[in-house]
Amino acid sequence: MTRTEPNRSRSSNSDSDKNSGNVGGGRTTGMRVIVPLQGVVQGRGGLFLGSVIPCAFFYFLQFYLKRNRKNDESDNSGEQNSSASSSSSPNSGLPDPTRSQSAGHLTELTGLPRSLSRILLSPRNSGGAVSVSGRVNCVLKGGDSSPYYVGQKRVEDDPYDELGNPDGVIQLGLAQNNKLSLDDWVLENPKEAISDGLSISGIASYEPSDGLLELKMAVAGFMTEATKNSVTFDPSQLVLTSGASSAIEILSFCLADSGNAFLVPTPCSPGYDRDVKWRTGVDIIHVPCRSADNFNMSMVVLDRAFYQAKKRGVRIRGIIISNPSNPMGSLLSRENLYALLDFARERNIHIISNEIFAGSVHGEEGEFVSMAEIVDTEENIDRERVHIVYDLSKDLSFRGLRSAAIYSFNESVLSASRKLTTLSPVSSPTQHLLISAISNPKNVQRFVKTNRQRLQSIYTELVEGLKELGIECTRSNGGFYCWADMRGLISSYSEKGEIELWNKLLNIGKINVIPGSCCHCIEPGWFRICFSNLSERDVPVVMNRIRKVCETCKSQN
């Protein structure tokens, strides 16, 4: 009997099988390994199909992989497409030495075709949402949906102009004073305003981040004039920074730790939510004042808020006041200031006195008293807990030239503030321009006087016009605002009713005002109106638009 050679071809074996027709036991086992489907499809047909189907499947798989490999590798110029035979070579299972081996679990996949490795790897976009810090969530919490920001956006998109856009939105929500500025002085003194003391080397070199000494001296003189010479300010206790918001934030950082809080009587500036909380982690506890008390602070209510916070485990580090008030424009009396100092001493907390409108006090009624004057004249007051914020941008109508001052009696706070202003310094051109503008006492006196007269005139005309429409305002003696009582126009005594009226004022009347809820007023229906940017010709236009809203509200009610 002829033996079957191990190296014979498959065709020879087939011929031998046909001739001999004799299949031994060992040969049967080998055939079943080579032809796995013979046991499924019986008979002579099973032998044929069991051989053809695996081979066809194998070659179709090779064709599929070859085609996809060509598509994947066509992006890499300079590489040749792999042939179908290379996949069966002895070295085809080894990792490609040109591939990176540093990816840990990817090392085992580097020998696979790219089409297979991509299937085995997790999708590139399966890592979930990219997280950000909790501080960002705090910033986004206020959102652009607040009426405070929505109104500003409407003004930006459709600003009123007497000639160019008479149907645009009139801005009555932002503290700006475009109608009076130092433009006249700039025109009269172009050399001093633009080039006096300036050079490329002068403005491009490093300067003290807390302000030039020459500017501090000029600011101290301006603050003395703004307070009607009631107190003399020491330039060495001044730290200059880029705006009142930056000053409030720096003081919040210096006086409180994350999780601590400040007491803030309300209604208050909408900006405190941003200035105090966003980056410091310090919280605000609002202390409500009511119209029945003319929105005056009550020491009893302050004391109650302090102890309620203490019971909740919140440490109160200070109180923030505005004098003149934002949004009401009222002034704090000497008695109020003394009571606040006693309260701060008894509770061992700080006082931040926001006096950014000190140079914009108008009217004959009331007297502006700076906290610095109280501290300067009283010997038994703990002055290290008193800190004052002053804003040159507001009083000088240089709102784009961000410049403000921290005036403190606490050396630790001053030292830390000087370092923190590295993140928010006043620009060199702004400093040199301000030095030229406010170093002349006569120029400062003339500007402050003109500013106060103009504010008083516009305020009086606006309040009288509102009164004719049945809208009363609280008495304002300082700043750019009047606090208008529109409770008679709201559809329901609620925040919802207040926002509905605000929408009508914005969309029907096309005027942007700030609803009291943005100022944390607990009584709905009050609105902050900024009048400083109005001219005498603008006031009748505003009155006509508010009258239109009043008629709409009355017809609907």
Swiss-Prot record:
EC number: 2.6.1.-
GO terms of biological process kind: biosynthetic process
Cofactor section: pyridoxal 5'-phosphate
Gene3D superfamilies xrefs: Aspartate Aminotransferase, domain 1 (3.90.1150.10), Type I PLP-dependent aspartate aminotransferase-like (Major domain) (3.40.640.10)
Segments of this protein annotated with the region Disordered: 1-29, 70-104
Transferase in keyword set: yes
Induction entry: By indole-3-acetic acid (IAA) and cycloheximide (CHX).
Keyword Transferase: yes
Source taxon at top rank: Eukaryota
A Pfam family this chain is assigned to: Aminotran_1_2
Modified residues (N6-(pyridoxal phosphate)lysine): K394
One annotated GO molecular function: transaminase activity
Biased composition annotated in UniProt, kind: Low complexity: 77-92
Expression tissues: Expressed in roots.
Alphabetical UniProt keywords: Aminotransferase, Pyridoxal phosphate, Transferase
Family indicated by similarity: Belongs to the class-I pyridoxal-phosphate-dependent aminotransferase family.
Assembly and interaction partners: Homodimer.
Job of this protein: Probable aminotransferase. Does not have 1-aminocyclopropane-1-carboxylate synthase (ACS) activity, suggesting that it is not involved in ethylene biosynthesis.
Protein name per Swiss-Prot or TrEMBL: Probable aminotransferase ACS10
